[in-house]
Structures are given as C-alpha cells and as structure tokens.
UniProtKB/Swiss-Prot annotation:
Its EC number is 7.4.2.11. The gene is metN3. It is a peripheral membrane protein. Residues 2-239 form the ABC transporter domain. One of its GO terms (cellular component) is plasma membrane. Part of the ABC transporter complex MetNIQ involved in methionine import. Responsible for energy coupling to the transport system. GO terms for molecular function: ABC-type D-methionine transporter activity; ATP binding; ATP hydrolysis activity. The complex is composed of two ATP-binding proteins (MetN), two transmembrane proteins (MetI) and a solute-binding protein (MetQ). ATP binds at residues 36-43. It comes from Pseudomonas fluorescens (strain ATCC BAA-477 / NRRL B-23932 / Pf-5). This is Methionine import ATP-binding protein MetN 3. It is found in: Cell inner membrane. Transmembrane segments: none annotated.
Length: 325
C-alpha cells in the first residue's frame, strides 16, 4: 500500500506549488489512475512516489516505510520493488530487445544464464517472444512500450508506475497496452499507479482514481464509489448521465447498479408491491474499471411522488444507488 500524506512540492521561492497538500491512499493490487490536464501536477506526484523528485514537505509511506526517512542504501533497496514505464520508452537503441530488458538485472548482478531465462520469460509475457534479437528501430511504438514494460518488470517489483505510457500511441495500440497492464495486475498481483489526461484510460482499467488540478487533489476513491456518488464530478465524467428533457412535476431518478445486480427485475417486483406505475426513460450498461456498470433513468406520475421515494429507499437498502432529479 502507498500512503501519500499532505505532500507539497515547490520548485523555487515565489513559485506556485506544483503539489499542494495532496493526500491519497493506493490500496494493494489496485490499478490507480491519476487524472488531470497538463500542468496539474501528475508527473510531479508520480516522480515523488519513488523519490526521483524530493517533496518539499509531507510524507510518502510505502508498505509502511517512510521513504523520506530511509538512508541512501535503504532507498535503493526499496526502489528495487518499484518499476517505471515512460511515455518516450527510454530504450537503448544500440542494444537488442533482450539486452534492453536485461539492464536492471545486470545492475543487480544477476548471472548471464539467469538473466537470459528471466528476460525470455518476460518477453513471452508481453507478447514479444519472437523479438529478442530485434533492435528498437525495428519495432512499432506499441512494441517499444511492451519492451519498456518487460524491463520495468525485470527485477520483480511490487509496484509499477506508468508516466503517460499510452499518450503517444494510437487508440488500437493504447487498448492493447491497457489490456496488458490489466493482465499484469491480475496475474502478478502488482499495484499499478498510472497518470493520464485521458478519461478513457481510467475508464478502461482503473479500480481507483484521483483527479488533480493546479497541484491540488480534487477527489479520489474507488471508481465504483465515485460512480455511485451523485456529487462526484469525476464519477459524472467517467459515466455521464442522460441528457433528456425534464418535466419538473414528474418524479425522476437515475439509478446506478454494478456487475450482477439485477435492477430491472427488482424494479418490477418493488413497483408491483407498491402499486406504482414506472416508466423507464433510458438505460444502458458499460464496462468501467473492469466492472459492468448500469444506469437507468426512471419516472413516475406526479401523484405518485411519495411511493416513488419509498421505491428509491427500498432500492438503496438492496445496494442500488439513486439520484433524485
């Protein structure tokens, strides 16, 4: 688990804070997306997580250890558990794919035969088993990023930090890289922190998310909680409501339900019990953060406003969230 506590970063006297009292918690095995526009402080925050950037104040706890309190040798050991992938790939063009992935293992002093076995295993994992002897110039952008991911995994990290890793890729390649990251999270149990300016990236694979603006944390939490909170701007951005004409005299609500929650049969049962005639104005199901999320817009006659509210209360007791409009 990573805990960020009241983190501040100021680059110079009189300069605005790049990070201003940011606090958040990244649970173990989460895919945590940090969303924001250019200049929001995303990259600064990510670089602070492994102390490539030293914060001006505040603390970063990783597995309970305060990184800022570690000695140089202790910090080096801690960093061995943190992999990082970059927007620009950062590959050595004079070395083969195999030799690029082997760099962290060479630094760690692993023997040649062990290095080779580990590298070939990783190349199979990222779908480049046939590219070991190729050079970066012979690869596509997506393949280069797969090499970068394999290199980041070489030392067997517990955490993987992704700095806009898909922003230079086309949509199809972006989708394949995100699928690979989701697979790595699922199969290896890594905790992944990724920064992005694209809502679709968060929507595709993130279990948790935070939004930054002007160096400040706007909101954070589990994606499911954000989607179910009518007050969450990030939740509304990830899954916008229905833009329908609104009759102010007619009670309406928007329901949010997840995975195997069966909203339609439950609505039918409860409305029948209350002799309430409901109209379904709109509905749909989408995949968000690896979960199925459904939305329904429902309405009733003005005379049934009391029964309608009772229905929403009964739905809430069964785990289906609603926003009265």
């Amino acid at each position: 688990m990573i805990e960020v506590q009241q983190l501040c970063k100021v680059y110079g006297e009189g300069q605005p804070a790049a990070l201003d009292r940011v606090s958040l918690t990244v649970p173990d095995r989460a895919v945590y997306g940090i969303l924001g526009r250019s200049g929001a402080g995303k990259s600064t925050l990510l670089r602070c997580l492994n102390l490539l950037e030293r914060p001006s104040s505040g603390r970063i706890l990783m597995d309970g250890q305060d990184l800022g309190a570690l000695s140089a040798s202790e910090l080096r050991r801690q960093r061995q558990g943190i992999g990082m992938i970059f927007q620009g790939f950062n590959l050595l063009h004079s070395r083969t794919v195999e030799d690029n992935v082997a760099v962290p293992l060479e630094i760690a002093g692993l023997g040649k035969s062990q290095r080779r076995a580990r590298v070939l295993e990783l190349l199979e994992l990222v779908g480049l088993g046939d590219k070991a002897q190729a050079y970066p110039s012979q690869l596509s952008g997506g393949q280069k990023q797969r090499v970068g991911i394999a290199r980041a995994l070489a030392a067997g990290p517990r955490y993987l930090l992704s700095d806009e890793a898909t922003s230079a890729l086309d949509p199809e390649t972006t989708a394949s890289i995100l699928q690979l990251l989701a697979q790595i999270n699922r199969e290896l149990g890594l905790t992944i922190v990724l920064i992005t300016h694209e809502l679709e990236v968060v929507k595709a694979i993130c279990s948790h998310a935070a939004s930054l603006a002007g160096g400040r944390l706007m909101e954070s939490g589990a994606v499911a909680e954000l989607l179910g909170n009518p007050q969450s701007a990030l939740g509304r951005a990830l899954l916008p409501g229905y833009n329908l004409p609104f009759n102010g005299s007619q009670p309406q609500a928007e329901l949010t339900f997840f995975d195997n929650q069966r909203a339609a049969p439950l609505l039918e049962q409860l409305s029948r019990q209350q002799a309430l005639e409901l109209k379904v104005l709109a509905g749909g199901v989408e995949a968000v953060g690896g979960r199925r999320v459904g939305r329904l817009r429902i309405a009733a006659a003005p005379a049934d406003a009391g029964k309608f509210q009772q229905l929403l209360t009964a739905l809430a007791q069964r785990g289906i969230r609603s926003e009265r409009l």
